[in-house]
Regions:
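Gly/His-enriched, cation/cofactor- and phosphate-binding structural elements
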Residues: 202-320
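Glycine-rich, Lys/Arg-enriched anion-binding loops that position phosphate/diphosphate groups
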Residues: 136-254, 258
Length: 320
């Protein structure tokens, strides 16, 4: 049965776009309306970011009403449960339907996410994206610099004065609904990519754990390029300093330092400072590895044309 999803009209923000996009993914047979008319809202199956009610079981997801107390909870350093980021519409919808959204998107991409995996992906996505949408909407954080944050990107799709001044009310409402659907498509695509990457990490995890280790266990050797390894190595392999793997085109083998923590730009170790920014013949001369290709100036990745060359570079880096 077609689900009627309602949100407010006028200017949209990331939280209402995101919430509606999530529901649209969970319920592919749907219609979206934008209104503040209480009578029309009352007929909707879901009402997002308008209506003055937070009642998930009834499909109501507003956060503007007086007395609203919805917030995430986290454990502090002492193990006590404390209030964290306050919900906006995006977080309210995600808390209720995030896992189902992940499973629906995974299925649409030809994969399966069981309840455990889907719950983990949903939690990761809330931590990486949804809570920031909520923070911005609630005025608790600034948008990303420039126009690169998702909230700013979606805001750019709103109609502007030059367009609005030429349209009557009916034409303007139609254009705003069209732009809202454009914004929903951006969110849907972003969710798809996040879910696909997360499933890839889950599928690859077993291969990463079983991969060969050399140099007394300090170098992990992956036989397939492009495999997501960072989370498993950072969280489960404290002794691994470097990861060696073929470039996706197999034109070279690369060695990469392991981040000190997930999301960190600091590494457990750096490559030799003398290699920084060198390429080809210069790097070969300085390193003593004939087929050395490059070393990034920030000393976190380097490469050679052969596996033997990359492993030799890894051994030299560890021997410093």
């Amino acid at each position: 049965m077609k689900q009627l999803i309602a949100t407010h009209d006028g200017t949209f923000h990331a939280d209402d776009v995101f919430g509606v996009a999530v529901l649209a993914a969970v319920f592919p047979d749907h219609e979206v309306i934008r209104t503040r008319d209480p009578e029309r809202l009352s007929r909707a199956d879901f009402v997002v970011d308008v209506g003055g009610t937070w009642e998930p079981a009834a499909g109501r997801f507003d956060h503007h009403q007086r007395g609203f107390t919805g917030a995430r909870t986290r454990q502090d350093a002492d193990g006590q449960v404390v209030r964290a980021e306050v919900y906006a519409a995006a977080g309210l919808v995600w808390a209720e339907h995030g896992r189902a959204c992940v499973q629906q998107l995974a299925q649409s991409l030809g994969h399966r996410a069981d309840d455990v995996l889907a719950a983990r992906i949903a939690a990761d996505l809330d931590d990486a994206l949804v809570r920031y949408i909520d923070l911005i909407d609630n005025g608790a954080a600034d948008v990303a610099p420039g126009i690169f944050g998702l909230s700013s990107q979606l805001a750019l799709l709103n109609t502007g004065w030059l367009e609005e001044r030429q349209l009557d009310a009916q034409a303007l409402a139609a254009l705003q609904l069209e732009r809202f659907h454009e914004a929903m498509a951006v969110v849907h695509r972003a969710l798809q990519r996040f879910v696909l990457r997360a499933i890839g990490q889950a599928v690859a995890a077993g291969d990463v754990r079983g991969a060969e280790r050399v140099a007394q266990g300090r170098v992990l050797l992956l036989r397939e390029g492009g495999m997501p390894w960072t989370r498993v190595v950072v969280e489960e392999m404290p002794e691994v300093m470097l990861v060696v793997f073929p470039e996706s085109s197999r034109a070279q083998y690369q060695l990469r330092t392991v981040p000190a923590a997930l999301g960190s730009f600091a590494s457990r170790m750096d490559l030799p400072a003398a290699w920084a920014g060198l390429r080809d013949a210069q790097l070969a001369q300085v390193s003593g590895v004939p087929d050395a290709v490059f070393c990034h100036k920030n000393l976190f990745i380097a490469g050679a044309r052969s596996l033997e060359g990359a492993l030799r570079m890894a051994a030299l880096a560890l021997a410093r």
